């Protein structure tokens, strides 16, 4: 009994040496297991993304996956077996759908149309994916559009009648270029056919063949039957639309022009009485020039007329616009004022020249032969511009002798500059 207890009883505790040896054995076993797991074959299958361009529709057939098939030597793993089956199935599906990459994007042939009609009768008008699988080279969208726009049995392919064009015009006035909505209102006409008819009518108006067709139509009006004539309801409607657009553009341009005219008014609007700016500004000045001309034409001013001699102490110049005297004697001013009051004014003779032009030429160039007798004194009787000052104070106003009895005239600028420099007193005649 004791031996059995020793055999079946609890093991005695291990010593330090036994624990060390036991750890070494465990490490060896772990390393062997790792080596055996490395030697096992690993099968990897990669399935790439399959993308199929189906008439502007991209369909992705599943993500990329990596599946590891682990076979433990001769023993087959059931999980690995399932993964292998799914990988094989995916590979078969990918090979099937890879063949549908090469789609035909050209026109449909008569054979394809007949096959599509037969498939639609078998599967109906909704299962386009199934129909496209049996129709090689065509996508589901291509089959659907071909059927609804061309192969449907209720589609009208003859010319448009006046009633159809009237419905088209009325619907276009209400909803605009919504061809799908208009197609619901016109039985037998698809969205594509309505749009094509609209564009063809518009292009026919703008083409150069229009005049030839009109001339031929005028010649053949008597022979042509009413059914052969093309309805012109849509054509007239398109013309009215274009005419309205042109009128709108013209109105906008007119509004822009009126705004620009209002922002920049003319002088004729300012002077509404018919007087121009030159006549308004030139009226008073012409009268003043006539006044000066009459004075100097009838009463030329000189030192002798003023009762002054050249031997006086301070004598200043006389010009055609007034007197400048630097003399403290008040009697001199009185004599000048009296002489100015006693001067008589006579109206000048009517001449084709302006008084301002004659007066300026008289100031700058002296008197001419044609006007010396009527308006201004002759060169022999014209006065001289003299300035007598003590010690020659003002060189600008020095007298200039002339051997030919012509005396230099002084213009307004020289007269004013002399009056400012000499601090002279100016007595205007006006």
Swiss-Prot record:
**Protein name in the entry:** Transcription factor MYB119
Quote the gene name from the UniProt entry. Answer: MYB119
Concerning InterPro entries, the annotation shows:
Homeodomain-like_sf, Myb_dom, MYB_TF, SANT/Myb
Let me know which tissues express this protein, per UniProt: Expressed in ovary septum and stamen filament.
Q: Where is the composition biased (Low complexity)?
A: 374-387
Where does it primarily localize? nucleus
Write down the superkingdom of origin.
Eukaryota
GO CC: one term? nucleus
- DNA-binding residues per UniProt? 128-151, 179-202
Tell me where in or outside the cell this protein is found.
Nucleus
Report biased composition (Basic and acidic residues) as residue ranges. Answer: 214-224
Q: What does this protein do?
A: Transcription factor required for female gametophyte fertility. Acts redundantly with MYB64 to initiate the FG5 transition during female gametophyte development. The FG5 transition represents the switch between free nuclear divisions and cellularization-differentiation in female gametophyte, and occurs during developmental stage FG5.
Q: Where is the composition biased (Basic residues)?
A: 200-213
| CDD domains the record matches | SANT (cd00167)
Establish whether keyword Repeat is in the entry: yes
Q: Where is each HTH myb-type domain found?
A: 100-155, 156-206
């Amino acid at each position: 009994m004791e031996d059995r207890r020793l055999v079946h009883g609890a093991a005695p505790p291990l010593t330090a040496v036994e624990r060390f040896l036991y750890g070494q054995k465990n490490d060896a076993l772990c390393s062997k297991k790792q080596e055996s797991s490395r030697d096992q074959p690993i099968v990897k299958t990669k399935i790439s993304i399959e993308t199929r361009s189906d008439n502007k529709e991209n369909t992705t057939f599943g993500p990329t996956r990596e599946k590891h098939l682990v076979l433990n030597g001769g023993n087959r793993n059931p999980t690995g077996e399932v993964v292998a089956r799914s990988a094989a199935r995916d590979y078969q599906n990918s090979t099937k759908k890879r063949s549908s990459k090469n789609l035909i994007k050209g026109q449909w042939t008569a054979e394809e149309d007949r096959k599509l009609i037969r498939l639609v009768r078998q599967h109906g008008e909704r299962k386009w994916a199934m129909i496209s699988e049996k129709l090689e080279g065509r996508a589901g969208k291509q089959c659907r559009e071909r059927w609804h726009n061309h192969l449907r049995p209720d589609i009208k392919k003859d010319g448009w009648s006046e009633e159809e064009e009237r419905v088209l015009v009325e619907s276009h006035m209400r909803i605009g270029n919504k061809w799908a909505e208009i197609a619901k209102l016109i039985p037998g006409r698809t969205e594509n056919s309505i749009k094509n008819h609209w564009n063809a009518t518009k292009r026919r108006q703008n083409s150069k063949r229009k005049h030839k067709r009109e001339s031929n139509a005028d010649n053949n009006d008597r022979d042509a039957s009413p059914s052969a004539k093309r309805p012109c309801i849509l054509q007239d409607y398109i013309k009215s639309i274009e005419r309205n657009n042109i009128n709108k553009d013209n109105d906008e341009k007119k509004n822009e022009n009126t705004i620009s005219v209002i922002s920049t008014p003319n002088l004729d609007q300012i002077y509404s009485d018919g007087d121009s700016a030159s006549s308004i500004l030139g009226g008073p000045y012409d009268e003043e020039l006539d006044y000066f001309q009459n004075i100097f034409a009838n009463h030329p001013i000189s030192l002798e007329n003023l009762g002054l001699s050249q031997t006086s102490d301070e004598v200043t110049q006389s010009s055609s616009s007034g007197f400048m005297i630097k003399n403290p004697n008040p009697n001199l001013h009185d004599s000048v004022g009296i002489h100015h009051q006693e001067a008589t004014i006579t109206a000048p003779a009517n001449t084709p020249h302006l008084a301002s032009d004659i007066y300026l030429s008289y100031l700058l160039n002296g008197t001419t032969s044609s006007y010396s007798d009527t308006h201004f004194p002759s060169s022999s009787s014209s006065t001289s511009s003299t300035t007598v000052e003590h010690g020659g104070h003002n060189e600008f106003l020095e007298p200039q002798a002339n051997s030919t009895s012509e005396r230099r005239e002084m213009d307004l600028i020289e007269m004013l500059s002399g009056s400012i420099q000499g601090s002279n007193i100016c007595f205007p005649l006006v």
